[in-house]
Amino acid sequence: MQSSLIKILGVLAIVATLVCFVFAALGMIGAVSVGNGCYMRYAPGGKGGSDSITSTITLNANANYVNTSTMLPDGTMQLTPDPAHYGEWLNTQVEVKDKQAVSLQVVGQISLCLAYVPKDNLQFTESTRPGKSNLDDNGKMIPIPRVTDVNKPPLSLIMDAKNNEWRNITEMYANDRILVSVTPNYSPGAGGTVGAMDAFKGTNVTADCSQGKTAYDPICGRYSIYSGPYVNACELKQNYWQGNKKQKCPNGCVWGTIDWCYTAPSAWCTYYYVCDSLSAWVNNYGTMPEPYKDDGTFTFSWASNSGGIFIDYANLQCSNNINIPPNGKCPDSVDDRSPKDKDYIGGAGCTSGVCNGGEFQSQRRFWYTSDGNGGKGPTGLIWQISNTSNVDSTLPSTLQFAQFVTASDQPTEYGNEYKVIYNIPFNSNTDKGYLQYRLWCPTSQDASKNTGGYVMNIKQTKCYRENGNSLTDVFNNRGQVQYLVVPSAENPNTSGKNYSPEAAIVDSKGKANFNAAGEGYIWMRVLNDPNDYKDSEGSYKVHFSTSQSVGSFTIKVMNPLLQLFKGKVKGAAESIFRNIVCYGGDTSSCTNFFNYIKALLILYVMVYGAMFLLGFAKINQKDLVVRIVKIGIVSGLMNGNTFEFFNNYLFDTIANFSDEIISNMSGYSLFNSNGTVSNPFMFLDAVMSRILFSQTFMAQLLALLSLGLSGIIYFIITVIAVMIVIITAFRAAAVYIMAFMATCILIGIAPIFISFLLFDFTRYLFDNWVRFTIRYMIEPVVLMAGIIVLTQLFTIYLDFVLGYSVCWKCALPIKIPFIGTILPVALLNVPIFCINWFAPWGMDYMSGMMGVNMQNIVALVIIAYGMYGYVEFSGNMVARLTSAAGPSATSMGGAMSGAAEQGALSQVGMDEKTRKGITGRAKERLKQRNETLKQAEKTRKNAPKEEPPKAEIPK
């Protein structure tokens, strides 16, 4: 029992292993894709005689199509471009002929170079880091990630508020895509530290960004331009200054009146001033900036002008002229120390002491933050685009304050970590520009006392091109789609030849048209600086559409064959005729057959005259006329112009009789556009050219296999029908050739048979010569008459069966059988993978349905077999019509094509040997069956009859 179980398990293991191998093989087949090409049913404009081919290729920006595999630490394999294959041409697999029209559309976006941190950037300038402002600490240029690199963070540059000048964040060329963002204001709470990546050091730098401090690192995302003391309260000081001055006269004045002394001349009265001790609201000072608070107490909100983000604390005074200290004299140096901003600073309700309850206390602002304190953008950040990269501190008359983009334009991968402030493509008439930023600060102020700063982040897609359009930056026509037409056996990447590429001039939608300059395959690449291919990224989808002329069966096969054969046969027949009559040449090597005819003619007249004189022959009027006509015909053809007469009048008329009749029946002209004689097989050109030379037809035929098992049956039946038609066409050609050759030979030996007209006992030879000549002239006509009709029917039904456009795509999905018994119903009908194959345009591979009517396929086979049988039928028909028993062109043509015909039919089991074998075996089985039945009947008759049992008689 145990051994049986082990055997069963072993068998199951072997079966499981085989199944795994089968699925692995099918998986590899399913992964194969020869392209996205399609073969269209109809050519553009509905014209026939051409294959309308569409194809799609992927054109890499780096022009590298060779990958190398690298083992990663986790054990997985990573494919990377081979460094030795950048800038190579791609074979599109689109084959063209010279001057063939090709239409294409280039779709997609690519980046053909990498952006780097510019000189005089936000973090360093050439004055602070000579010759290395754009290099990291290792002396290397710092690349900027592309906008499309969603898995990479943007490059961060730290902008210090102490730098009161325009700095470059990037260098821009036409069509560049830029994404500038700012890191939000960090508020980690008390004692918290934050970090930012320093692109120059290549490390993460940290700083304490907790609230309650008056100085911060630039990575904290806040800055202040304020420093030093400022008025933060007003205090009433009694007896602060001497005011309200009065003149006082001392004792001994003339009149002794003080009041009068005020106005009395000094000559009359000596006086002095007396003042009152007055109070004043004096400034109480604090130090700017006030400690930063996370709740935004001392933070400006975003504004679109400098007036909204600046408070001039120097002009705030509790009293007029309070900034001028009292001199202690009467009167004081100023006579006005009345309250100025006391109510605003200290509050109107406060009348003594230190007052700090004014509206000013809630409106104090010292800090600018990158989140704008809830505003529309980073506060105080201004930008401009400059034509030069020079560092400059001059502010323009109109300032552009950075703003956050709308929520819909904010990349989802940025989240709340980065806030985008610039995403405008650079489309300028200038060759290049520099995007510059700075933190706003009054130009008259010493920026070195500022504190804090912002962290700016950038992504840039440089050398951006789309839809095959090219632009000139530092490299001419960068991004131009170029093509070559190279012979099929040649590879421009390895041939070592110098080529002159052509440019595909595209419109704004990427569409272009060109005529191929040569014959071969189209190779393409994107033009770029050779040094930038390795940094290029992206790819184009190039959609091709072209109409390729299908090779003509008439031009490629029949015309060369018939012209060569007919020329040789006709020349041989003329040579025979010429040699018989010794025409136009050296007569020393030939004997003029006309001399024999003359002798026979003289003998004929002499014998017939002697018989008439001796009374052995009776001559009536009819007999006399017939004999005179015979003598006239024979004697008339025995002059030196006989050959010209036959050659110029009779030979071509008789030899080309069949061609003219067949051409008239088929509706095709016997003459080409250049006036030369064509061949009578023009009616076969459309169907035979499609079968033998059309790529679309082959794809349509192979697409039948995408139907699975039923498709295999359809495919076999259709192939059989097509093979029969091909065999019939070549057999008809063989019949035509043999008939033409026989006709030419009979005409060539005409002088011999014409002489047989003289005597009654040789006249049957002349009659048979005429009969066979007519037979071989008519036989191709009768044959082609039926073939023409059947060919038209075959063409119609062939289009019914294969009338669809074909694409290379997923056609045969592979599913696990009985999956519903193991997995949930939701996983039913889900393919594991799919095998790519030719399939009709629009067919759903999940359903496998395609509109192929079995009736049309059966009709196709019937018509094809009817064409095959009609060849023999037409030969028998002509034999009856002409009453010419003997070899026919049909039998001779069948013998010529027999070997090839039987060999082709043997592949599908329809050759004569196989059919005779099937017929013989069927007859043998029928014979054995009849013998068995006869033997059974004989046995039954010879068997003794059993008598019924006799009834027992009771005793």
From Swiss-Prot:
Specify whether Oxidoreductase is a keyword of the entry.
no
Cited InterPro entries: Conjugal_tfr_TrbL/VirB6
Q: Where is this region: Disordered?
A: 127-146, 905-955
Q: Name one Pfam family in it.
A: TrbL
Gene Ontology BP, a term: protein secretion by the type IV secretion system
Transmembrane spans? 597-617, 707-727, 739-759, 781-801, 818-838, 857-877
Which range is the signal sequence, renumbered to this chain? 1-24
GO CC terms of this entry: plasma membrane
Instruction: Describe the family membership recorded for this protein in Swiss-Prot or TrEMBL.
Output: Belongs to the TrbL/VirB6 family.
The name on file for this protein is Uncharacterized protein RBE_1263
Q: Species name for this entry?
A: Rickettsia bellii (strain RML369-C)
At the highest ranks, the source species' classification is: Bacteria, Pseudomonadati, Pseudomonadota, Alphaproteobacteria, Rickettsiales
